[in-house]
Protein backbone atom coordinates (compact mmCIF):
# COMPACT_ATOMS: atom_id res chain seq x y z
CA UNK A 1 0.00 0.00 0.00
CA UNK A 2 1.36 3.42 -0.93
CA UNK A 3 2.22 5.81 1.87
CA UNK A 4 -0.52 8.29 0.95
CA UNK A 5 -3.15 5.58 0.62
CA UNK A 6 -2.11 4.00 3.91
CA UNK A 7 -2.34 7.31 5.74
CA UNK A 8 -5.79 7.96 4.32
CA UNK A 9 -6.96 4.48 5.21
CA UNK A 10 -5.65 4.86 8.73
CA UNK A 11 -7.42 8.18 9.17
CA UNK A 12 -10.63 6.92 7.59
CA UNK A 13 -10.77 3.84 9.77
CA UNK A 14 -9.90 5.96 12.79
CA UNK A 15 -7.40 3.49 14.14
CA UNK A 16 -3.75 2.63 14.24
CA UNK A 17 -2.73 -0.81 15.33
CA UNK A 18 -4.73 -1.11 18.52
CA UNK A 19 -8.19 -0.90 16.98
CA UNK A 20 -9.17 2.27 18.85
CA UNK A 21 -10.26 5.60 17.42
CA UNK A 22 -7.38 8.05 17.09
CA UNK A 23 -6.98 11.74 16.50
CA UNK A 24 -6.00 13.29 13.18
CA UNK A 25 -2.64 14.17 14.72
CA UNK A 26 -1.97 10.54 15.48
CA UNK A 27 -2.92 9.62 11.92
CA UNK A 28 -0.38 12.11 10.62
CA UNK A 29 2.23 10.52 12.83
CA UNK A 30 1.31 7.16 11.31
CA UNK A 31 1.96 8.61 7.85
CA UNK A 32 5.47 9.57 8.89
CA UNK A 33 6.16 6.15 10.34
CA UNK A 34 4.53 3.84 7.80
CA UNK A 35 6.34 0.72 8.88
CA UNK A 36 4.81 0.92 12.36
CA UNK A 37 1.17 0.93 11.26
CA UNK A 38 0.82 -2.83 10.79
CA UNK A 39 3.60 -3.92 13.17
CA UNK A 40 2.65 -2.63 16.61
CA UNK A 41 -0.03 -5.16 17.47
CA UNK A 42 1.01 -6.77 20.69
CA UNK A 43 -0.01 -10.27 21.62
CA UNK A 44 -3.17 -9.19 23.46
CA UNK A 45 -4.43 -7.15 20.50
CA UNK A 46 -3.88 -10.07 18.13
CA UNK A 47 -5.57 -12.51 20.51
CA UNK A 48 -8.55 -10.19 20.93
CA UNK A 49 -8.94 -9.59 17.18
CA UNK A 50 -8.63 -13.23 16.11
CA UNK A 51 -10.91 -14.41 18.92
CA UNK A 52 -13.66 -11.98 17.96
CA UNK A 53 -16.91 -12.70 16.16
CA UNK A 54 -17.11 -12.79 12.37
CA UNK A 55 -20.11 -12.55 10.05
CA UNK A 56 -20.82 -14.01 6.62
CA UNK A 57 -23.36 -12.04 4.59
CA UNK A 58 -24.77 -13.01 1.21
CA UNK A 59 -26.31 -11.04 -1.67
CA UNK A 60 -24.88 -7.68 -0.57
CA UNK A 61 -25.16 -4.69 -2.91
CA UNK A 62 -24.12 -1.06 -2.66
CA UNK A 63 -22.51 1.82 -4.51
CA UNK A 64 -18.97 3.04 -3.85
CA UNK A 65 -18.71 6.29 -1.92
CA UNK A 66 -15.69 8.41 -1.06
CA UNK A 67 -14.90 8.64 2.64
CA UNK A 68 -11.82 10.69 3.55
CA UNK A 69 -10.18 9.59 0.29
CA UNK A 70 -11.00 5.89 0.66
CA UNK A 71 -13.53 3.85 -1.31
CA UNK A 72 -16.33 2.51 0.89
CA UNK A 73 -19.58 0.64 0.35
CA UNK A 74 -22.31 1.14 2.93
CA UNK A 75 -25.03 -1.42 3.58
CA UNK A 76 -27.39 -2.55 6.33
CA UNK A 77 -27.55 -6.14 7.52
CA UNK A 78 -29.29 -7.58 10.58
CA UNK A 79 -30.26 -4.08 11.79
CA UNK A 80 -26.61 -2.96 11.74
CA UNK A 81 -25.15 -0.32 9.41
CA UNK A 82 -21.87 -1.46 7.87
CA UNK A 83 -19.09 0.49 6.20
CA UNK A 84 -16.95 -1.70 3.92
CA UNK A 85 -13.51 -0.32 2.97
CA UNK A 86 -12.01 -1.38 -0.37
CA UNK A 87 -8.27 -0.84 0.04
CA UNK A 88 -6.56 -3.50 -2.12
CA UNK A 89 -7.23 -5.20 -5.45
CA UNK A 90 -10.94 -4.91 -4.69
CA UNK A 91 -10.66 -1.13 -5.04
CA UNK A 92 -10.00 -1.53 -8.77
CA UNK A 93 -12.34 -4.49 -9.20
CA UNK A 94 -15.34 -2.73 -7.68
CA UNK A 95 -14.89 0.86 -8.81
CA UNK A 96 -18.63 1.54 -9.02
CA UNK A 97 -19.84 -0.75 -6.27
CA UNK A 98 -20.82 -4.34 -5.51
CA UNK A 99 -23.96 -6.24 -6.50
CA UNK A 100 -25.14 -9.57 -5.12
CA UNK A 101 -21.78 -10.38 -3.49
CA UNK A 102 -20.81 -12.36 -0.42
CA UNK A 103 -18.98 -10.37 2.26
CA UNK A 104 -16.95 -11.77 5.16
CA UNK A 105 -17.04 -9.22 7.97
CA UNK A 106 -14.80 -8.71 10.99
CA UNK A 107 -15.35 -5.59 13.08
CA UNK A 108 -12.50 -3.08 12.94
CA UNK A 109 -14.39 -0.48 14.98
CA UNK A 110 -17.79 1.14 15.50
CA UNK A 111 -17.68 4.79 14.41
CA UNK A 112 -19.49 7.64 16.25
CA UNK A 113 -22.49 7.16 13.91
CA UNK A 114 -22.84 3.53 14.94
CA UNK A 115 -21.51 2.12 11.66
CA UNK A 116 -19.47 -1.06 11.87
CA UNK A 117 -16.30 -0.65 9.80
CA UNK A 118 -14.77 -3.65 8.03
CA UNK A 119 -12.14 -4.13 5.30
CA UNK A 120 -12.22 -6.35 2.18
CA UNK A 121 -13.61 -9.88 2.29
CA UNK A 122 -15.76 -9.51 -0.86
CA UNK A 123 -16.28 -12.60 -3.05
CA UNK A 124 -18.77 -13.75 -5.65
CA UNK A 125 -22.07 -15.22 -4.48
CA UNK A 126 -21.05 -18.76 -3.62
CA UNK A 127 -22.89 -22.04 -3.91
CA UNK A 128 -23.55 -23.04 -0.31
CA UNK A 129 -23.19 -26.73 -1.20
CA UNK A 130 -19.55 -26.23 -2.20
CA UNK A 131 -17.13 -27.60 0.39
CA UNK A 132 -13.40 -28.29 0.24
CA UNK A 133 -11.48 -30.12 2.95
CA UNK A 134 -7.80 -29.20 2.98
CA UNK A 135 -4.96 -30.63 5.04
CA UNK A 136 -3.72 -28.17 7.67
CA UNK A 137 -0.20 -29.05 8.81
CA UNK A 138 0.76 -27.42 12.12
CA UNK A 139 4.39 -27.46 13.28
CA UNK A 140 5.09 -26.12 16.78
CA UNK A 141 8.74 -25.23 17.30
CA UNK A 142 9.72 -24.71 20.96
CA UNK A 143 13.46 -24.43 21.41
CA UNK A 144 14.90 -27.55 19.85
CA UNK A 145 11.62 -29.46 20.01
CA UNK A 146 9.21 -29.98 17.10
CA UNK A 147 5.60 -31.06 17.57
CA UNK A 148 3.80 -31.81 14.27
CA UNK A 149 0.04 -32.23 13.78
CA UNK A 150 -2.28 -32.67 10.80
CA UNK A 151 -5.81 -31.23 10.92
CA UNK A 152 -8.60 -31.02 8.36
CA UNK A 153 -9.59 -27.47 7.44
CA UNK A 154 -13.00 -27.03 5.79
CA UNK A 155 -13.78 -24.26 3.28
CA UNK A 156 -17.51 -24.07 2.53
CA UNK A 157 -17.37 -21.86 -0.56
CA UNK A 158 -15.78 -21.94 -3.99
CA UNK A 159 -14.29 -18.44 -3.94
CA UNK A 160 -12.83 -17.37 -0.61
CA UNK A 161 -11.06 -14.19 0.48
CA UNK A 162 -7.58 -14.25 1.97
CA UNK A 163 -9.11 -12.30 4.85
CA UNK A 164 -11.49 -15.16 5.66
CA UNK A 165 -8.80 -17.83 5.34
CA UNK A 166 -6.41 -15.88 7.55
CA UNK A 167 -9.05 -15.17 10.19
CA UNK A 168 -10.44 -18.71 10.40
CA UNK A 169 -7.03 -20.39 10.37
CA UNK A 170 -5.76 -18.13 13.16
CA UNK A 171 -8.96 -18.60 15.14
CA UNK A 172 -8.43 -22.36 14.87
CA UNK A 173 -4.86 -21.90 16.09
CA UNK A 174 -5.99 -19.70 18.99
CA UNK A 175 -8.56 -22.27 20.13
CA UNK A 176 -6.52 -25.43 19.59
CA UNK A 177 -2.82 -24.51 19.69
CA UNK A 178 -2.51 -21.61 22.13
CA UNK A 179 -1.63 -18.99 19.52
CA UNK A 180 -1.19 -15.54 21.14
CA UNK A 181 -1.01 -17.02 24.63
CA UNK A 182 2.19 -16.74 26.63
CA UNK A 183 4.95 -16.02 24.12
CA UNK A 184 3.45 -17.92 21.17
CA UNK A 185 3.14 -15.08 18.69
CA UNK A 186 5.63 -15.72 15.91
CA UNK A 187 5.50 -17.95 12.86
CA UNK A 188 3.71 -18.02 9.53
CA UNK A 189 0.86 -19.50 7.52
CA UNK A 190 1.69 -20.79 4.04
CA UNK A 191 -1.19 -21.48 1.66
CA UNK A 192 0.18 -23.72 -1.10
CA UNK A 193 -1.66 -23.70 -4.42
CA UNK A 194 -1.77 -26.53 -6.94
CA UNK A 195 0.06 -24.45 -9.57
CA UNK A 196 3.07 -24.06 -7.27
CA UNK A 197 2.25 -20.52 -6.16
CA UNK A 198 1.79 -19.72 -2.49
CA UNK A 199 0.49 -17.08 -0.12
CA UNK A 200 2.43 -16.42 3.09
CA UNK A 201 1.04 -14.69 6.17
CA UNK A 202 3.15 -13.47 9.10
CA UNK A 203 1.58 -14.52 12.40
CA UNK A 204 3.38 -11.69 14.19
CA UNK A 205 1.14 -9.10 12.52
CA UNK A 206 -2.48 -8.66 11.61
CA UNK A 207 -3.13 -9.30 7.92
CA UNK A 208 -2.42 -6.10 5.97
CA UNK A 209 -5.49 -4.11 4.93
CA UNK A 210 -4.61 -4.23 1.23
CA UNK A 211 -4.43 -8.06 1.25
CA UNK A 212 -7.90 -8.45 2.78
CA UNK A 213 -9.37 -7.94 -0.70
CA UNK A 214 -7.41 -10.81 -2.31
CA UNK A 215 -9.45 -13.88 -3.31
CA UNK A 216 -8.63 -17.52 -4.04
CA UNK A 217 -10.50 -20.44 -5.58
CA UNK A 218 -10.74 -23.03 -2.82
CA UNK A 219 -10.33 -25.84 -5.39
CA UNK A 220 -6.87 -24.46 -6.22
CA UNK A 221 -5.56 -24.90 -2.66
CA UNK A 222 -3.28 -27.91 -2.28
CA UNK A 223 -2.45 -27.68 1.43
CA UNK A 224 -1.98 -25.20 4.25
CA UNK A 225 1.11 -25.22 6.45
CA UNK A 226 1.58 -23.41 9.76
CA UNK A 227 4.77 -22.90 11.74
CA UNK A 228 4.35 -21.70 15.34
CA UNK A 229 7.38 -20.41 17.22
CA UNK A 230 7.68 -19.69 20.92
CA UNK A 231 10.35 -17.34 22.22
Curated annotation (Swiss-Prot):
Q: Which domain of life is it from?
A: Bacteria
Per the UniProt record, one Pfam family is Stap_Strp_tox_C
- Impact of changing residue 68 to Y on the protein? Loss of host IgA binding
> What InterPro entries has UniProt attached to this entry?
Enterotoxin (IPR008992), SSL_OB (IPR015282), Staph/Strept_toxin_CS (IPR006126), Staph_exotoxin (IPR008375), SuperAg_toxin_C (IPR016091), Superantigen_bac (IPR013307), Toxin_b-grasp_Staph/Strep (IPR006123)
Cell compartments where the protein resides: Secreted
**What UniProt keywords apply to this chain's record, in alphabetical order?**
Secreted, Signal, Virulence
Keyword Transit peptide among UniProt keywords? no
What GO cellular component is one of the record's annotations? extracellular region
Signal sequence: where?
1-30
Coarsely, its chief localization is secreted
Q: What does this protein do?
A: Plays a role in the inhibition of host complement-mediated lysis and serum bactericidal activity by interacting with complement component C5. Affects all three pathways of complement activation and inhibits the cleavage of C5 by preventing its binding to C5 convertases. In turn, prevents C5a-mediated neutrophil migration.
This protein's assembly is summarised as: Interacts with host IgA and complement C5; these interactions inhibits complement activation.
Sorted alphabetically, which NCBIfam families does this protein's record hold?
Answer: PRK13346.1 (NF009887)
Q: Which family, according to UniProt?
A: Belongs to the staphylococcal/streptococcal toxin family.
Which protein is depicted? Staphylococcal superantigen-like 7
Species name: Staphylococcus aureus (strain NCTC 8325 / PS 47)
Amino acid sequence: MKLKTLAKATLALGLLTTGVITSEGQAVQAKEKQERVQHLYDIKDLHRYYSSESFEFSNISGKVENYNGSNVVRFNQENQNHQLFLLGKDKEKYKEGIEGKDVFVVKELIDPNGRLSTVGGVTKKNNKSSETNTHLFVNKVYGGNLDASIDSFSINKEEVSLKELDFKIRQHLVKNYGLYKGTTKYGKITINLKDGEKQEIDLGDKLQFERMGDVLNSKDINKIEVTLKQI
